[in-house]
């Protein structure tokens, strides 16, 4: 195979805000299934940078730790992301290896992959809690060199940590530009080594150069 195509997960293959909304819906049902407005109230608190879980604890008595646990362990509703598996399969059909590098809790990230129906499509998955280090640690990327392909691509979104290691390792780094919904801001004024070599507005644009 001539290329290894490695993706970030949050705000690349799936929007983190959609995971948050899915979790909030599940928590709202658990906390007060009779209150149809609780979900919107939680979003209002979040958007106003209030501590959502502390507010729920104060109003309903559920502990912050219990709420965090449900947030991290729930299986999200990602029905709107049917196109992700089709995208990955296109790369497989082109003869590419595909991989994932993501930071976070193992159960949380694996539940996202299962909800997307893509866990089994990857040739290699690196999740920080399982692997023992987070981006931008080069080891999280170097492990893909065992696939021994000519070219390596990393597609992510976070200019603070996604592109530093692949740039240093000679990979081709690609940034999916923020459509206004990302959790983390993108800073293109950083040193060049932190910045992607290419930018795209849609993942399907990858097929124009891979």
Give residue spans per PLM region.
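Conserved functional loop/turn residues at catalytic and ligand-binding sites
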Residues: 10-13, 95, 117, 170
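Generic enzyme active-site microenvironment
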Residues: 6-8, 101, 155-156
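Conserved SAM-binding loop
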Residues: 13, 98, 154-155
